[in-house]
């Protein structure tokens, strides 16, 4: 893909497709959840995009084994005080077995929406503020940089997993650096229990060999008062201000990784 800016909403439906930017081609759009759908996107003057519909690039379930490299995928909408429905997704995948290398995912709220299993992100840059890595899928995010922003006066939450009980192990962040800007309160994440989920949700996330800044509260909390507490988050062999952080036993860690060993662990050198 030639280095240029490609403005619009794009959808991938083809399996075993490879798209590689020459250096860093940009795909960008500026829709948000509560925005009326534009005419060019099939709008009727009433319907809104919704969270899923706000994505600049969407990968449909049929597009398995997708490979993307050397791209910037951006939602350029900027949140405005008082607006309802500020979720602005840059990228959503609904397909399994995707590999994403050297991709910049840029947005604010709900940047990266992972809603399928067995996706692998390597050497990526991801930025946002509220729940900006989220979804029900299983994914490894390896050797990447994640930036937590301050947009308006809201707290920042790095991730919001809503892992299905039948899924493998939710999100794994490995060999990754977290950086931050602003003075807002920042949390590792919050467990998401969406209304209308197709099955029981047990949010799961693991941070392995991750370097955290001092201003991040190393907890995953519930999203709403009264939400269940049946979520799990683990921090292993990680650092915050030079202090080693571990909250899981080695035996449990080995069990946690069992599913990924054949497909992924040789790639991420754990």
Each language-model region and where it sits:
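Sequence-level preference for short, compositionally simple segments enriched
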Residues: 2-267
């Amino acid at each position: 893909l030639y280095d240029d800016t490609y403005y619009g909403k794009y959808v991938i439906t083809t399996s075993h497709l490879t798209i590689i930017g020459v250096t860093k081609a940009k795909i960008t759009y500026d829709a948000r959840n509560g925005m009326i759908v534009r005419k060019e996107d099939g709008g009727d003057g009433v319907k809104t995009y919704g969270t899923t519909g706000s994505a600049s690039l969407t990968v449909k379930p049929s597009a398995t084994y997708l490979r993307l490299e050397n791209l910037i995928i951006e939602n350029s909408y900027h949140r405005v005080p008082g607006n309802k429905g500020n979720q602005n997704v840059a990228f959503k995948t609904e397909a399994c077995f995707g590999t994403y290398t050297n991709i910049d995912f840029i947005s604010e709220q709900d940047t990266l929406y992972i809603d399928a299993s067995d996706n692998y992100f390597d050497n990526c840059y991801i930025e946002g503020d509220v729940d900006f890595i989220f979804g029900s899928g299983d994914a490894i995010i390896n050797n990447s940089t994640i930036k937590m922003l301050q947009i308006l006066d809201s707290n920042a939450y790095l991730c919001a997993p809503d892992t299905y009980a039948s899924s493998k192990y939710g999100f794994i962040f490995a060999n990754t650096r977290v950086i931050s800007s602003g003075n807002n309160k920042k949390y590792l994440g919050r467990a998401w229990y969406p209304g209308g989920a197709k099955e029981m949700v047990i949010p799961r996330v693991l941070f392995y060999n991750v370097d955290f800044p001092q201003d991040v509260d190393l907890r995953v909390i519930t999203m709403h008062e009264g939400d269940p507490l049946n979520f799990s988050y683990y921090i292993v062999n990680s650092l915050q201000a030079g202090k080693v952080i571990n909250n899981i036993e080695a035996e449990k860690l080995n069990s946690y990784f069992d599913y990924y060993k054949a497909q992924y662990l040789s790639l991420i050198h754990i």
